[in-house]
UniProtKB/Swiss-Prot annotation:
UniProt subunit comment: Component of the complex IV (CIV, cytochrome c oxidase), a multisubunit enzyme composed of 14 subunits. The complex is composed of a catalytic core of 3 subunits MT-CO1, MT-CO2 and MT-CO3, encoded in the mitochondrial DNA, and 11 supernumerary subunits COX4I1 (or COX4I2), COX5A, COX5B, COX6A2 (or COX6A1), COX6B1 (or COX6B2), COX6C, COX7A1 (or COX7A2), COX7B, COX7C, COX8B and NDUFA4, which are encoded in the nuclear genome.
Gene Ontology terms for molecular function: cytochrome-c oxidase activity
Location in or out of the cell: Mitochondrion inner membrane
SS bond list: none
Taxonomy, superkingdom: Eukaryota
Membrane topology: Single-pass membrane protein
Pathway it works in: Energy metabolism; oxidative phosphorylation
Protein name, per record: Cytochrome c oxidase subunit 7A1, mitochondrial
Gene Ontology terms: biological process: generation of precursor metabolites and energy; mitochondrial electron transport, cytochrome c to oxygen; mitochondrial respirasome assembly
PANTHER family, sorted: CYTOCHROME C OXIDASE POLYPEPTIDE 7A (PTHR10510), CYTOCHROME C OXIDASE SUBUNIT 7A1, MITOCHONDRIAL (PTHR10510:SF5)
Residue intervals annotated with topology Mitochondrial matrix: 22-46
Entry's family note: Belongs to the cytochrome c oxidase VIIa family.
Alphabetical list of SUPFAM superfamilies matching this protein: Mitochondrial cytochrome c oxidase subunit VIIa
């Protein structure tokens, strides 16, 4: 009997009302990403997307240059 009361209390505390604290912004995001304003899709999220894009590109290009440097260094053995 005690387990039944505990389970009912847990169900009440984790009900759907706790999920409604955040506003649903799907419609706003759909309008933002579907409008035709000649901005690339990966930059439509704002300044955070712009920074994330630049950091990702910098890391990718840096890794590519470093891997080519390592291949070149390994291909000429020391005597």
């Amino acid at each position: 009997m005690q387990a039944l009361r505990v389970s009912q209390a847990l169900i009440r505390s984790f009900s759907s009302t706790a999920r409604n604290r955040f506003q649903n912004r799907v419609r706003e995001k759909q309008k933002l990403f579907q409008e035709d304003n000649d901005i690339p899709l990966y930059l439509k999220g704002g300044i955070v997307d712009n920074i994330l894009y630049r950091v990702t590109m910098t890391l990718c290009l840096g890794g590519t240059v470093y891997s080519l440097y390592s291949l070149g260094w390994a291909s000429f053995p020391r005597n």
